[in-house]
Amino acid sequence: MSPECAQTTGPGPSRTPDQVNRTHFPFFSDVKGDHRLVLSVLETTVLGLIFVVSLLGNVCALVLVVRRRRRGATVSLVLNLFCADLLFTSAIPLVLVVRWTEAWLLGPVVCHLLFYVMTMSGSVTILTLAAVSLERMVCIVRLRRGLSGPGRRTQAALLAFIWGYSALAALPLCILFRVVPQRLPGGDQEIPICTLDWPNRIGEISWDVFFVTLNFLVPGLVIVISYSKILQITKASRKRLTLSLAYSESHQIRVSQQDYRLFRTLFLLMVSFFIMWSPIIITILLILIQNFRQDLVIWPSLFFWVVAFTFANSALNPILYNMSLFRSEWRKIFCCFFFPEKGAIFTETSIRRNDLSVIST
């Protein structure tokens, strides 16, 4: 072991012979060979584009939602979703640094925090989507019974639970990710890598099963059940729409259309999440299986592109949300920028439209 690698590992608990002799998965560290420059430029271009789109999209979505000055539970959860996306994509610059340097040169502290923050923010995202679907279902049931929605304390407690549980569930990654020296395929010497170093196989298997079940499968089941129930209620309500005497007919249709738009948007967010997060969940399970099947090879480059695909979800979420619910606002911004005369007209009409709530509370 070179002195540099020995210093990089830093102080920590003593490692068992099994941990020392084990070949660890290098995650973002990789030896790219002769095409290193071309591959690094391609990776930087893709992740850089995702980072810019995600940053602008989520910030604009936050501003547009806050400007409506609504304080419902759905609004709080949607804002929480955008914040989680911003936190998740904040890891992109660090990932690019590792892809350029190949070896891990960011130190042990960043090694502990990088994957922890990524996992925690991903957990917050799916739990928030599950909470949104559950809140929508409960809200519809409450409205049918003439009851009010959850108060601010309940909303704050729900957000605190989502972040607190996600932080605790991902805590083993913060503890067990460490910098170790390892010789990678294609390399001629050991280099420091940031990897997950479990003390035993049982703990690794237990945590993987626990995390995938409680942070992916269970929220997914909640989402499916909630939206199925919402769909049933929506169909039944539309059949009775013309028979209701509580509101005028035009108001009933307007509310129904708004609820349907919100339902469709949140459903798209849910579908996109499962499509774009399923590959990384499967890859993590394959990395676990790789410990027992040495003939199963998972290249770090494959892991990178799977993570890049997952990063893209954070850029897609605000696009889906904005295009579905804020078309008029984006049209106004476009016209104000390119056609100032038309922008004034959109500004006047948007003031009247702001009185209508896109997100029912």
Swiss-Prot record:
Q: One GO biological process from the UniProt record?
A: ghrelin secretion
- Residues with PTM Phosphoserine: S350, S357, S360
Q: In what way is this protein post-translationally modified?
A: Phosphorylated at two clusters of Ser and Thr residues located in the intracellular C-terminus. Prerequisite for FFAR4 internalization via an ARRB2-dependent pathway.
Q: Where are the transmembrane segments?
A: 46-66, 78-98, 104-124, 157-177, 205-225, 269-289, 296-316
Where on the tree of life does the source sit, at the highest rank? Eukaryota
Q: Which residues form the signal peptide?
A: none
For membrane topology, the record states: Multi-pass membrane protein
Q: Which PANTHER family match?
A: FREE FATTY ACID RECEPTOR 4-LIKE, LEUCOKININ RECEPTOR-RELATED
What's this protein's function? G-protein-coupled receptor for long-chain fatty acids (LCFAs) with a major role in adipogenesis, energy metabolism and inflammation. Signals via G-protein and beta-arrestin pathways. LCFAs sensing initiates activation of phosphoinositidase C-linked G proteins GNAQ and GNA11 (G(q)/G(11)), inducing a variety of cellular responses via second messenger pathways such as intracellular calcium mobilization, modulation of cyclic adenosine monophosphate (cAMP) production, and mitogen-activated protein kinases (MAPKs).
Q: How does it assemble?
A: Interacts (via C-terminus) with ARRB2 following LCFAs stimulation.
* Family assignment from sequence similarity: Belongs to the G-protein coupled receptor 1 family.
Name by which UniProt lists this protein:
Free fatty acid receptor 4
Gene symbol here is Ffar4
